[in-house]
From Swiss-Prot:
GO molecular function annotations of the record: tryptophan synthase activity
Alphabetical UniProt keywords: Amino-acid biosynthesis, Aromatic amino acid biosynthesis, Lyase, Pyridoxal phosphate, Tryptophan biosynthesis
Catalyzed reaction equations: (1S,2R)-1-C-(indol-3-yl)glycerol 3-phosphate + L-serine = D-glyceraldehyde 3-phosphate + L-tryptophan + H2O
Lineage: Bacteria, Bacillati, Bacillota, Clostridia, Eubacteriales
Organism: Clostridium novyi (strain NT)
Cofactor: pyridoxal 5'-phosphate
Protein name as it appears in the record: Tryptophan synthase beta chain
UniProt keyword annotation of Transmembrane helix present: no
Enzyme Commission number(s): 4.2.1.20
Length: 389
């Protein structure tokens, strides 16, 4: 199994974690090629999560923008309301096969926390979620859901109290307790094998999209668009299309208050190659080599780096990465609500916002597929506060 994507990825970890990661890699490789494991995973995708998720032709959105046809991949309709459950079920099934009794996870927007707590409840495992204090304030609804599902929440006070800090604390805990504990990492980040493992559990998004668009349109789309924090929903959509070279692939990062202000989460716009959370990738660093704090109105996008496979796709020119500001994302959130009766997550609203810029400049026979990675119930309070400022 490849440990790197070009010069990105790898395993930049302490000695204590090396053997744990080797054991994880061996088990993942063993079970992802095991028919019984695959059968069980697909059973839960279909009968618990509710897959395949719909590919929906957004007729009014298309008409109002006046350009390319827009399809939405409806990951918001999954059980728990986002794409995160695809990966959580896969990793916890693996944890059970490995004989682990407990799971830990980090969360930003709370969606991965809810998905992990849900899967832990389903399979009867003890669950602890690390969440930044700032994110707990922003995501009260998801915090309460996790507690209802039986998870213990560990507030993280260090740093800015956001996603990066939650990952730091979760990794520290894992070093101490890896004998009986499995770390369910929520995005396509971290040391090998996590970026590959998360992609493998999320690529169902792109595989379904391929089948669905061929059935509906008789051809593949021209453009794929997805939001990118760490980038698991995006790599899940993109991966099955990478070899289809005529398809444009666009990842949308958090522009926050504007890249020029320094308050954003757009690593590609303002980053350099460095090491974070056990991987080499593109990260936001200051001149002294310290990781900058990321900012976004969206709790799931304020990560100061990107998954290493995204860094590689950008490096070889196979995908391009753009940014959308808070203001643009909120406008897109409102626009989709008003035009399609769909309340998107703030993360997904970044992808919708870029689609709103791009689609009117494309011919009407062109096709865009946007990954609607999650639903926006969790964000309604944040939006309300933002609009009433």
């Amino acid at each position: 199994m490849k440990k790197q994507f070009g010069k990105f990825g790898g395993q930049y970890v302490s000695k204590e974690l090396t053997s744990t990661l080797k054991n994880l890699e061996e088990n993942f490789f063993k079970y992802c090629n095991d028919d019984d494991f695959k059968k069980e995973y697909i059973y839960y995708l279909n009968n618990y999560i509710g897959r395949p998720s719909l590919l929906y032709y957004a007729k009014r959105l298309t008409k109002s923008l006046g350009g390319a046809k827009i399809y939405l991949k409806r990951e918001d309709l999954n059980h728990t309301g986002a794409h995160k459950i695809n990966n959580a079920i896969g990793q916890i099934l693996l944890a059970k096969r490995m004989g682990k009794k407990k799971v830990i996870a980090e969360t930003g927007a709370g969606q991965h926390g809810v998905a992990t707590a849900t899967a832990a409840a389903l399979f009867g495992m003890e669950c602890t979620i690390f969440m930044g204090e700032e994110d707990i304030k922003r995501q009260k609804l998801n915090t309460f859901k996790m507690e209802l599902l039986g998870a213990k929440i560990k507030p993280v006070k260090s740093g800015n109290g956001t996603l990066k800090d939650a990952v730091d604390e979760a990794i520290k805990q894992w070093v101490k307790s890896s004998d009986d504990t499995f770390y369910v990492l929520g995005s396509a980040v971290g040391p090998h094998p996590y970026p590959t493992m998360v992609r493998e559990f999320q690529k169902i998004i792109g595989e379904e999209t391929k089948d669905q668009i061929l059935r509906m349109e008789g051809r593949l789309p021209d453009t794929l668009i997805a939001c990118v924090g760490g980038g698991s929903n995006a790599i899940g959509l993109f991966y099955p299309f990478i070899k289809d070279e005529n398809i444009e692939i666009i990842g949308v990062e958090a522009g926050g208050k504007g890249v020029e202000t320094g308050e954003h989460g757009a690593a590609f716009a303002d980053g350099r190659v460095g090491v974070i959370h056990g991987m080499k990738t593109v990260i936001m660093e200051d001149d002294n080599g310290n990781v900058k704090e990321a900012y976004s109105i969206s709790a799931g996008l304020d990560y100061p780096g990107v998954g290493p496979e995204h860094a590689y796709l950008n490096d070889i020119g196979r995908a391009k990465y753009v940014s959308i500001t808070d203001e643009e994302a909120v406008e897109a959130f409102k626009y989709l609500c008003a035009n399609e009766g769909i309340i998107p997550a703030l993360e997904s609203s970044h992808a919708i916002a870029y689609t709103m810029k791009l689609a009117p400049n494309m011919d009407k026979d062109k096709i865009i597929v946007v990954n609607l990675s999650g639903r926006g119930d969790k964000d309604v309070e944040t939006i309300s506060e933002y609009l009433n400022k």
